[in-house]
Amino acid sequence: VSLGFWHNFGDTGVYENMRQMCFTAFDHGITHFDLANNYGPQPGSAEENLGKILREELSSYRDELIISSKAGFDMWSGPYGNWGSRKYLIASLDQSLKRMGLDYVDIFYHHRPDPNTPLEETVRALDGIVKSGKALYVGISNYNKEQTIAAAAVSYTHLTLPTTPY
């Protein structure tokens, strides 16, 4: 079970409500907080708000928390502000880490398949993110069965890190 930050933790929400939701979840044993770079509303604001909560009150519990984030949707204009290129995924994660005030996330997901970037580039970028220490684990989100099988095949063929199929 995780607490999702999609539309509940953006700039349009009341900060005290966000804080209370986090603490209620944590006090009831929910330690997985799930975010994405574009969660808000205002893209990135959910990560900023969690970062504030972490800094002010939950930093001593970081080792008990699983923080996940995702990238794959629009974040900035231009050819590298969206989808699944290596440049976009790494830049997005770097910005997410900065917003949350973290050195790493526990899980980083590619949020949706990219029809224009070779799957091998996306999967290798995820592998590189783990190797860099910016994420402990990586995964995919919103991939259908065939896309998941293809991504797994690429990972088994091209990655240097072992993969776990869950």
Give the positions of each predicted feature:
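Distinct, well-ordered alpha-helical segments
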Residues: 45-56, 117-125, 144-156
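Active-site groove signature of glycoside hydrolases
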Residues: 100-115
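Short, acidic/polar
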Residues: 14-25, 85-98
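Conserved, mostly hydrophobic/aromatic
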Residues: 3, 33, 50, 67, ...
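Conserved small/polar residues in nucleotide/adenosyl-binding loops
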Residues: 157-163
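Active-site beta-loop-alpha junctions enriched in small/polar residues
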Residues: 6, 36-38, 70-74, 110-113, ...
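N-terminal binding-site loop/beta-alpha segment at the start of enzyme catalytic domains
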Residues: 1-65, 131
